[in-house]
C-alpha cells in the first residue's frame, strides 16, 4: 500500500465518523447570537477563498452555541447586477460565432456542464448555482439554517418588495437625488461600471484632466496641464497617436484617451481621423498668451514657458471659473424633472451640450487607471443621468461614526472604516442593464448590486415565515399582499393597516422574530468590502433602524493564497470547495483553514498541511479510542487519593490551554485556537508520558477538553467523539486548576536541560553534577530588604523615573562596595529585582523538583545526573559541572 492509499484509507475512516445535522434556529428563552456573511455571487461554484471567509463566521457560530447562545447563521445568494446577465449575453454571442475576449462556454464547461445552451438565459444561472452552493456548504458542515436562504432580484417577489421598501424610505428621508455625474462607464454594456462589475480596476475613480490649448495651424492642440507656472513640454513623433475631431465648428487634436472619454461627456463631438503627429512643432504653433518663450530641444520636442505673473494670475482665474461652471452644471436635483441653474442657465438634460472650457483651458474626465468591465470593455468616463444615494450627507455621516464608535472591530479595519466615512460621496445606484429590483418611481432603472445588499440581514429573520423555497414560489404569506405596509409593521414597528388584519398572527410572528434576533452581532467579510459594502451596511442601518438595531461587531480577513501563490484558474493554482473537501475531507480542510491566518493580511492554504492534518487528526482519534478502552476497564468507583507532581503539571497545563483557547475564540484568532486546543494538548500528553505520568483518567480529561474545544473547528467529527467516547453534553471545558506552581517548576527543569545541552563541556562528558543552593548571598539579601521597603510600582514603568533610579542605585552602592561586587553587575541585579520581583520568589522546592525529575533530565540530556546542595550555589541558579 503506497502513501496515497494510506492517506485515502485514513481519510475515508475520518469521513465515516463525521456526523452531520440539520440546523433550525427559532426563537427561544436563550440569549441570541446573530452571525452573517456577505451572500456570495452566483456566477459560479464556491472556491476555497469563499470558504476561508465563511469559516470565520462558522467557527464562531459553533463556539457561541457551546457558550449557550441561540445562534442564527443564515446565508442567501446574490444574483443582482451585471455579471450574470453579461455572461449569459456573451455566451449567446459566442454560440452565434461572434468573437469574445474570454470564452464563457469554456468557463461553464470547466464547471462541469456539458450542455451550455441553457446558460444563455440569466435565470438558469440563478436556478443552478445556489443549489450547488448549498450542497458544498452542507458537505463542509456549515452551521447554517438553510430555511432562511433566498435569491435576490425581482425573480423573488418578496425580496424585490423588501428592497423597494428600503429605497422608498431612503427617498422619504431625503437621502436620494437625481442628476448628472461623471462616472466610470462601459461602452460595451452601455452603463455605469462600478467595483463589482469590473474585471480590473476596483476602487478606480474618475479624475479631472485640465487640458491647455495650443493653436497648431488651423487646429487647437489639447495638452495636459501641468502645475500653473511650470513649463509645458510638447512631444511629437512616431509614438504620439492623436485624434482629430470637431466640436461646434472648431477642430481639435488630442490624445486618443482624451477623445475616447470626451465623446461620452459632451454631445456634438464629430470624429474625423486618427493620425500620428509628426512635424516641426515650432512651425505653425501659435499661442494667445502675452509673453511666451519657446525652447527647441529637438525638431519634434520643445518646451513652452508661460510663467509671467500676468499669465499665472489669468490661468488661476480661468481654472477657478472652470470649477464654478462644473459645480453649477452638475448640481443634483431631487427628481428627474428638476431644473438646475447654471452659468448658461441650462437644464439638467442639456448639460452634455456644453464643453466646459475657458479661453485657455478645457476640462475632461478620465479614469485614474485602466478599468476593464467583466464584459471585457475598456471603460471610460461618461457624464450620466443617475440616481444617487447621498452618502456625503454630513448629518448621516455623523450617525455612522457614532455607530462605529460603539462597534467592535480590529484597529486596521476601524481605521479604514473611519477613513471611508470621510471620503465616501454620492453613490450612483441606478443601472440600465442586468438583474435586480427596479427603482419603484423610475422603472427604467435597476438598483445596483452594492445598494440592494445593505440591510438584507433583517430579511433573514423573517424569510422562513414568508415563503419556503429560494425564489418565493412556495408562498406562506401571499405575495400579492406585499407592500411597504408589511415591512413597516415588521421592521419599523408601525401599526398594521386594516387590509392586513387577516394576517396579524403571521406578521406579528415576523415582527417578534426580527425583534428577537436583531441586531447583527457579528458581520464577517473579506477586507475588500471595507471600502464599499461594509460602509454602506452601516450607513443604511443607521438610516433605517433604531439605534438598538445597529450592528455590534465586524470582523474582516485578507485574501487566501494557495501554496503561497495567488489563486488563479488560468495558472491552475486553484481549488474549489468541492475539490478541497474531496481531497482532504471536511475536518482536515477546516483545521487547515483555521491556521491559515486571522488578520487582514493575506492568508495561505498549504495543501501539504492539509494532508498532514489528515494524519494528525486520525492519530488523535485513534489515541482517544485506545484510551477509552483503558478507561472502561477501570472501576467506576475508583477515585484518586492524591495527585503526583506530574498530575498537577498536567492539570495546570490543560487549564492554561483551555483559558488560552477560549481567549483565542473570543478574539477570533483561530490559529491560536488550534495551537492550544490541539497541538499543545497533544504535546502535553507526550510530556506526561515522558515524565512517567500514569493516570488514565487525567489523560482522558486532556483528550475530552481538546475535543470539546475543537468542536467549533471540526463539529461533525467532534460530535461523534463526544457522544461515543466522552458521553458528555456539548459544552466548553473549564480550567481545573488556576495555580501554576508545577508549570513554573517544569519551566525551570526545561531551562536547566537547555543549559546542560548548551554547555561546551557537555559534548565529551557522560555525567552532569547539579549543585543547588538554599540561600542568596548576603549582599543580595540586603538589596532585597532595601527595595522591599520602598513603596513604588514593581514593573517596567518605574524605569522611566530617572531621578528615582539614580537615587536607588546610589543607596545600594555601599552594599556592593562592601561585598566587592562589580558595580555594573550589582546594578543589573537591582534593576532585575525591582522590575521582576516574582522571578526571585521560590514557588517550589528546587532540590525536590530536580530530584523528582532527575530521570527526565537524564533521558533528555543523555547523561547521568548527580544532585547535591552547595553553599556557593544560589536559589534557581545551580552550578553545573561535568565529568566523565
Curated annotation (Swiss-Prot):
Key word Repeat present: no
Keywords, alphabetical: Aminoacyl-tRNA synthetase, ATP-binding, Cytoplasm, Ligase, Nucleotide-binding, Protein biosynthesis
TM spans (from-to): none
An individual GO BP term: leucyl-tRNA aminoacylation
Binding residues for ATP: 569
Gene Ontology terms, MF aspect: ATP binding; leucine-tRNA ligase activity
Entries under Pfam families matching the protein: tRNA-synt_1
EC class (word): ligase
Catalysed reactions, as listed in the record: tRNA(Leu) + L-leucine + ATP = L-leucyl-tRNA(Leu) + AMP + diphosphate
EC number assigned by the record: 6.1.1.4
Positions occupied by motif 'KMSKS' region: 566-570
Coiled coil: none
Domain of life: Eukaryota
Motif ('HIGH' region): 40-50
Localisation per UniProt entry: Cytoplasm
CDD domains referenced in this protein's UniProt entry, alphabetically: LeuRS_core (cd00812)
A GO cellular component annotation in the UniProt record: cytoplasm
Family that this chain belongs to: Belongs to the class-I aminoacyl-tRNA synthetase family.
UniProt protein name: Probable leucine--tRNA ligase, cytoplasmic
Organism: Vairimorpha ceranae (strain BRL01)
Amino acid at each position: 500500500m503506497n502513501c496515497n492509499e494510506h492517506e485515502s484509507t485514513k481519510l475515508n475512516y475520518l469521513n465515516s465518523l463525521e456526523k452531520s445535522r440539520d440546523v433550525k434556529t427559532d426563537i427561544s428563552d436563550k440569549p441570541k447570537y446573530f452571525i452573517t456573511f456577505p451572500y456570495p455571487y452566483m456566477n459560479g461554484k464556491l472556491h476555497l477563498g469563499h470558504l476561508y471567509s465563511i469559516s470565520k463566521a462558522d467557527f464562531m457560530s459553533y463556539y457561541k452555541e457551546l457558550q449557550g447562545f441561540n445562534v442564527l447563521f443564515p446565508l442567501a445568494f446574490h444574483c443582482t447586477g451585471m455579471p450574470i446577465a453579461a455572461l449569459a449575453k456573451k455566451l449567446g454571442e459566442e454560440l452565434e460565432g461572434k468573437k469574445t475576449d474570454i470564452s464563457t462556454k469554456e468557463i461553464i464547461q470547466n464547471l462541469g456542464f456539458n450542455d451550455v445552451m441553457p446558460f444563455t438565459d440569466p435565470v438558469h444561472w440563478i436556478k443552478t448555482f445556489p443549489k450547488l452552493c448549498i450542497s458544498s456548504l452542507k458537505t463542509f458542515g456549515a452551521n447554517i439554517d438553510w430555511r432562511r436562504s433566498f435569491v435576490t432580484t425581482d425573480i423573488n417577489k418578496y425580496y424585490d418588495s423588501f428592497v423597494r421598501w428600503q429605497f422608498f424610505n431612503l427617498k422619504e428621508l431625503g437621502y436620494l437625488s437625481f442628476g448628472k455625474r461623471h462616472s466610470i462607464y462601459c461602452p460595451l454594456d452601455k452603463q455605469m461600471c462600478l467595483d463589482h462589475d469590473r474585471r480590473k480596476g476596483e476602487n478606480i475613480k474618475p479624475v479631472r484632466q485640465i487640458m491647455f490649448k495650443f493653436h497648431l495651424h488651423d487646429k487647437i492642440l489639447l495638452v495636459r496641464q501641468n502645475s500653473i507656472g511650470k513649463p509645458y513640454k510638447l512631444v511629437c513623433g512616431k509614438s504620439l497617436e492623436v485624434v482629430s475631431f470637431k466640436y461646434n465648428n472648431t477642430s481639435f487634436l488630442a490624445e486618443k484617451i482624451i477623445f475616447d472619454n470626451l465623446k461620452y461627456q459632451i454631445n456634438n463631438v464629430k470624429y474625423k481621423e486618427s493620425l500620428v503627429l509628426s512635424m516641426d512643432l515650432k512651425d505653425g504653433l501659435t499661442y494667445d498668451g502675452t509673453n511666451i518663450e519657446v525652447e527647441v530641444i529637438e525638431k519634434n520636442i520643445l518646451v513652452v514657458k508661460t510663467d509671467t505673473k500676468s499669465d499665472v494670475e489669468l490661468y488661476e482665474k480661468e481654472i477657478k471659473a472652470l470649477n464654478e461652471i462644473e459645480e453649477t452644471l452638475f448640481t443634483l436635483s431631487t427628481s428627474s424633472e428638476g431644473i438646475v441653474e447654471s452659468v448658461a442657465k441650462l437644464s439638467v438634460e442639456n448639460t452634455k451640450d456644453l464643453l466646459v472650457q475657458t479661453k485657455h483651458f478645457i476640462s475632461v474626465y478620465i479614469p485614474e487607471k485602466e478599468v476593464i468591465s467583466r464584459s471585457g470593455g475598456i471603460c471610460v468616463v461618461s457624464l450620466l443621468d443617475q440616481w444617487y444615494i447621498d452618502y456625503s450627507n454630513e448629518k448621516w455621516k455623523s450617525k455612522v461614526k457614532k455607530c462605529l464608535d460603539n462597534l467592535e472591530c480590529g484597529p486596521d479595519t476601524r481605521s479604514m472604516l473611519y477613513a471611508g466615512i470621510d471620503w465616501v460621496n454620492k453613490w450612483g445606484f441606478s443601472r440600465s442593464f442586468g438583474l435586480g429590483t427596479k427603482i419603484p418611481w423610475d422603472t427604467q432603472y435597476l438598483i445596483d448590486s452594492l445598494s440592494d445588499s445593505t440591510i438584507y440581514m433583517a430579511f433573514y429573520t423573517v424569510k422562513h415565515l414568508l415563503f419556503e423555497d429560494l425564489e418565493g414560489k412556495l408562498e406562506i404569506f401571499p405575495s400579492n399582499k406585499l407592500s411597504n405596509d408589511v415591512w413597516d409593521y415588521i421592521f419599523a414597528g408601525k401599526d398594521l393597516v386594516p387590509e392586513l388584519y387577516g394576517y396579524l398572527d403571521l406578521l406579528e410572528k415576523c415582527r417578534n422574530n426580527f425583534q428577537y434576533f436583531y441586531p447583527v452581532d457579528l458581520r464577517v467579510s473579506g477586507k475588500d468590502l471595507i471600502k464599499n459594502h461594509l460602509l454602506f451596511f452601516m450607513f443604511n442601518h443607521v438610516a433605517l433602524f433604531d439605534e438598538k438595531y445597529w450592528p455590534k461587531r465586524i470582523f474582516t480577513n485578507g485574501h487566501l493564497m494557495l501554496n503561497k501563490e495567488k489563486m488563479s484558474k488560468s495558472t491552475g493554482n486553484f481549488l474549489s470547495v468541492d475539490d478541497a473537501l474531496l481531497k482532504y475531507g471536511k475536518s482536515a480542510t477546516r483545521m487547515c483553514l483555521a491556521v491559515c491566518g486571522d488578520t487582514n493580511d493575506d492568508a495561505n492554504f498549504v495543501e501539504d498541511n492539509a494532508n498532514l492534518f489528515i494524519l494528525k487528526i486520525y492519530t488523535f482519534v485513534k489515541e482517544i479510542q485506545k484510551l477509552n478502552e483503558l478507561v472502561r476497564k477501570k472501576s467506576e468507583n475508583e477515585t484518586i487519593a492524591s495527585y503526583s507532581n506530574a498530575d498537577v503539571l498536567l492539570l495546570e497545563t490543560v487549564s492554561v490551554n483551555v483559558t488560552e483557547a477560549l481567549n483565542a475564540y473570543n478574539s477570533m484568532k483561530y490559529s491560536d485556537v488550534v495551537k492550544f486546543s490541539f497541538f499543545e494538548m497533544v504535546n502535553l500528553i507526550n510530556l506526561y508520558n515522558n515524565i512517567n505520568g500514569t493516570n488514565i483518567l487525567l489523560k482522558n480529561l486532556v483528550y475530552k477538553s481538546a475535543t470539546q474545544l475543537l468542536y467549533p473547528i471540526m463539529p461533525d467529527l467532534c460530535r461523534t467523539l463526544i457522544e461515543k467516547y466522552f458521553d458528555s453534553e456539548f459544552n466548553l471545558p473549564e480550567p481545573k486548576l488556576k495555580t501554576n506552581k508545577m508549570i513554573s517548576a517544569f519551566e525551570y527543569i526545561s531551562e536547566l536541560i537547555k543549559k546542560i545541552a548548551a554547555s561546551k563541556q557537555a559534548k565529551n562528558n557522560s555525567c552532569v553534577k547539579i549543585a543547588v543552593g538554599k540561600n542568596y548571598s548576603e549582599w543580595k539579601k540586603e538589596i532585597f530588604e532595601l527595595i522591599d521597603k520602598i513603596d513604588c510600582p514593581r514593573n517596567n514603568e518605574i524605569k522611566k523615573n530617572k531621578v528615582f533610579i539614580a537615587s536607588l542605585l546610589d543607596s545600594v552602592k555601599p552594599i556592593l562596595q562592601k561585598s566587592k561586587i562589580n558595580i555594573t553587575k550589582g546594578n543589573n541585579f537591582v534593576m532585575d529585582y525591582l522590575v521582576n520581583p516574582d522571578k526571585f520568589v521560590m514557588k517550589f522546592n528546587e532540590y525536590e523538583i530536580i530530584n523528582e525529575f532527575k530521570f527526565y533530565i537524564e533521558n533528555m540530556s543523555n547523561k547521568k545526573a548527580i544532585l547535591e546542595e552547595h553553599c556557593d550555589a544560589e536559589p534557581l541558579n545551580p552550578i553545573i559541572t561535568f565529568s566523565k
